[in-house]
Amino acid sequence: MKRLLPSLRTKKRYLAFELISEEPAGRGDIVKEVISSASSLLGDITTSDCDIRVLGFEAGKGIIQCSHTRVKETRAALATLTRVNGKRATLHVLGASGTVKKATEKFLKDYTVFEPEIHEKRDSRKTPGKVD
């Protein structure tokens, strides 16, 4: 199957957030509560249009991906989150960005919520063991 051209792909925004709660929560708990609060506020169709995904969550801070046309609705849905695992909690959006890297640099300076792996580039023209 062919990939979509870059001009036809949906554009995304990345929201950096912090969770303020009585007890620590895991990534799965956050995903469940974010989708639940979005669905109750916006309805199933608009929640689907928002395309909300939790990319990373660590030590109370994380990154959520959403559609660029639905950032306001996503922020509103995140503001309605009041409980995680039955304990009082609130989700505070620190800011929005067009790339994960910039969201991490600007809003999550001391956290490693989303660190892509760095792979070494190898020169495929050289054969191993052969001296030039």
UniProtKB/Swiss-Prot annotation:
- Catalytic reactions on record: Endonucleolytic cleavage of RNA, removing 5'-extranucleotides from tRNA precursor
Give the superkingdom in one word. Answer: Archaea
Q: Give the enzyme's EC designation.
A: 3.1.26.5
This entry's Gene Ontology molecular function terms read: ribonuclease P activity
Task: Name a single GO cellular component.
Answer: ribonuclease P complex
InterPro entries from the UniProt entry: Pop5/Rpp14/Rnp2-like, Rnp2-like_sf, Rnp2_archaea
Top-level class of the enzyme under EC nomenclature: hydrolase
- Keyword Nuclease listed: yes
A Pfam family cross-referenced in the UniProt record is: RNase_P_Rpp14
Location in or out of the cell: Cytoplasm
Keywords attached to this Swiss-Prot or TrEMBL record, sorted alphabetically, are: Cytoplasm, Endonuclease, Hydrolase, Nuclease, tRNA processing
Q: Which GO terms describe its biological process?
A: tRNA 5'-leader removal
- Quick check: keyword Hydrolase in the entry? yes
The record's annotation in HAMAP family points to: RNase_P_2
Provide the family line. Belongs to the eukaryotic/archaeal RNase P protein component 2 family.
Q: How does it assemble?
A: Consists of a catalytic RNA component and at least 4-5 protein subunits.
- Give a short account of what the protein does: Part of ribonuclease P, a protein complex that generates mature tRNA molecules by cleaving their 5'-ends.
- The identity of this protein, by name, is Ribonuclease P protein component 2
Q: Which organism is it from?
A: Methanosarcina acetivorans (strain ATCC 35395 / DSM 2834 / JCM 12185 / C2A)
Phylogenetic lineage: Archaea, Methanobacteriati, Methanobacteriota, Stenosarchaea group, Methanomicrobia
Q: What gene makes this protein?
A: rnp2
